[in-house]
Amino acid sequence: MPERTQAPVTLDIHQILSILPHRYPLVMVDRVTEITANKCIRGYKCVAYNEPWFQGHFPQRPIMPGVLILESLTQLGGILAYASDPFDATSNLMFFLGIDKAKFRHTVTPGDRLDLYAEVLHHRSNVWKLRGEASVDGTLCAEGEMLASIVDREP
C-alpha cells in the first residue's frame, strides 16, 4: 500500500478493499464519504436484492439481518481506525471484541442505501471504542457501541 501523510476525505471500493481483509460476500461498506481522523467517519452500503442472506432472511419479505448492519458499522470503524493511526493492513487485522447498547429500530430492505456513521468514543493503544448509527433516508435503523482491537494477522 502506498505511503501517505493524510487520509483521503473519501474512499472508493478499491481503497476500502486495500484496508479491510473482508471479501465477498462480507464487504459491508461500499464507499466512505467523509473522514475526520480520530473523530468520525461517514459512508454507505447499497443493499441489493441479490445479497446471499436474502435467500433465507426472509424469502417472502427480505430484511437485512441486524448483525450485518452492526458488521457494516464495525467495518466502517475499522476504516476510521486505519485513517486515524495507520497500521500495516497486510499484517494486522481489526478484531471485533464486543457490542453494547445495540438497538434495532427500523428494517433495512433490498434497494435501500444504508447510510453509516461512526465516531470514536475512546482510543488507547490498539483498542478502539466507537459509537455507530445506521440509517435509511434519514430514519435511524440501528445503533450501538463497538469495541475492537488491532491484532497481528498471524497468531
UniProtKB/Swiss-Prot annotation:
The entry's keywords: Cytoplasm, Lipid A biosynthesis, Lipid biosynthesis, Lipid metabolism, Lyase
Hydrolase found in the keyword field: no
Catalytic activity reported: a (3R)-hydroxyacyl-[ACP] = a (2E)-enoyl-[ACP] + H2O
EC number: 4.2.1.59
One GO term of the biological process aspect: lipid A biosynthetic process
Database matches in SUPFAM superfamilies: Thioesterase/thiol ester dehydrase-isomerase (SSF54637)
CDD domains: FabZ
Principal EC category: lyase
Residues annotated as catalytic: H57
Pfam families: FabA
Annotated transmembrane regions: none
Cysteine-cysteine disulfides: none
Molecular function (Gene Ontology), one example: (3R)-hydroxyacyl-[acyl-carrier-protein] dehydratase activity
Location of the protein in the cell: Cytoplasm
GO terms for cellular component: cytoplasm; membrane
Role this protein plays: Involved in unsaturated fatty acids biosynthesis. Catalyzes the dehydration of short chain beta-hydroxyacyl-ACPs and long chain saturated and unsaturated beta-hydroxyacyl-ACPs.
Family in the record: Belongs to the thioester dehydratase family. FabZ subfamily.
Protein name: 3-hydroxyacyl-[acyl-carrier-protein] dehydratase FabZ
